[in-house]
Amino acid sequence: MEENRPRRSRPEMGTPEYEEWRKCMLERRKKRLQRERRNRLIAIGAVILLVAGGISAGVTAFKEKNTAVSQQKKSASATKESNKTENQKNSQDESSKQNVLTEAAASEETVSGDTLAKADFLAQQYNYDKAIDLLKNDPDYGSSQKMQNAVKKYEETKATCTAWPLEEVTHVFYHILIKDTSKAFDGDYKEADYNQVMTTIDEFNKITQTMYEKGYVMVSIKDMAKVDENGNITEGEILLPPGKTPFVLSQDDVCYYHYMDGDGFATKLVLDEEGKVRNEYVEDDGSVSVGDYDMVPLIDRFVEQHPDFSYRGARGIVALTGYNGILGYRTDESYETRPADLDANKVQWLEEHPDFSLEKERTAAKKVADAMKAEGWEFASHTWGHQNVGQISLEKLQSDTEKFKKNVDPLIGGTDIIIFAFGTDLTNAADYSGDKFEYLKGQGYNYYCNVDSSQYFVQIRDRYFRQGRRNLDGYRMYYNPELLEDLFNAKEVFDSARPTPVPPMG
């Protein structure tokens, strides 16, 4: 029968399909009512015997109708569930697409942000050209207003820069910094020397902060003078905006000599878990602390906080001897060969370190030196044996230089800078000449530094660069504070733990 046919699923209300379905259902209902009237007339005119059959037929029809309705409901429910599943799938697909787009946009934003951050860091260190090139070469530059605005700002700042007179670049230096004044100034025979030529960490930090606030910026002497492959020297260029003043920084004897053990100084330079340069310091109970206890890590931390204290990544110059090794590592061959004239400090140290390995010491020292160079630090010879080059013979200078090149150069990658020990110089003459200069020049040295109390002393000649340095130590702060006024106020810096009067020289 027609009414037994499964009905099609009900469309969603409000749609054209629903209206068509509704008309169809009304027409079918009308036809069904007509049939039911006809059937009732037949049933009334039939004999009683057929009544039972009619009732039976009605019951059967009723059951079939219920079955059809049930099937219709099931079909509608299945269709509805199918539509729901399809809608959920479409929603999930759309959500996934949106997530991909969002993640892509976030990734692009991160990359763009990283590029801007790198450019800003370069600009803070006065490397405007490199910052501008970095942004202009970025694929997003054409559509990034932030990048274009940054380039405009860098170009405007660069336009304010002027070339600093190279003959007016000052050079300051320190020795190893005192961490514990109670040990350095404990009244023994070494106190006077420490008081004269050393600086405390507290003094150093105050000086650094004051110089930064005055606009001083660390530069490399290799920014001041350039060397070609033939050893010829030409003037460099230092471009700084108004209010900034360049200076060169150096530190002598960064070897952590045996005689300083137990006197309140760091014992070596090491790398921490992040690869940053730190110091080791031996506490009273023999335990070892790792921290920022000397110039190298203190300057590194300061530049991390104040990038504009460094000109294009420059740090300072670390001057090394070699007879006790370098950077706190016992890297000299004498620790292994143990000649008959080995000094008492080395003998004692070797007795306390029976597991000594020259190869391990050199490997560790080179690792630290490489990390320092990566941060912008430069190395210099301080002569292997801390020699007074103005007084020793040419033969002694040659022998000493050979030891330095054999024991130190391989660990630091070589150097063409020599910082003379004892503050001396090759000669007192106006210009370098003579056998000692020719020998050192032939050994590859192009940059020469002595000690000079004047504010500036710079010579740039065809074959060498020469610069005087100013000692920022107890002696200078106590006796000649007026010579330091361009840098800081000595009275505000002077450590109250330092014994006074500071012993005079000589």
Language-model features: locations:
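N-terminal targeting leaders characterized by basic, low-complexity, disordered sequences
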Residues: 1-32, 38
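N-terminal, intrinsically disordered, polar/charged segments of Gram-positive cell-envelope systems
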Residues: 21, 63-160
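Long, contiguous interaction/targeting segments characteristic
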Residues: 21-22, 44-50, 448, 463-464, ...
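Sec-dependent N-terminal signal peptides of Gram-positive bacterial secreted proteins and lipoproteins
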Residues: 40-62
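Amphipathic coiled-coil/heptad-repeat helices and related helical stalk/stem segments
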Residues: 115, 204, 364-365, 433
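C-terminal active-site subregion of NodB/CE4 polysaccharide deacetylases
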Residues: 123, 129-136, 141-142, 148, ...
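Metal-dependent polysaccharide deacetylase catalytic core of the NodB/CE4 family, i.e.
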Residues: 167-187, 231-232, 240-247, 254-426
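Membrane/wall-proximal cationic-aromatic binding patches
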Residues: 218-232
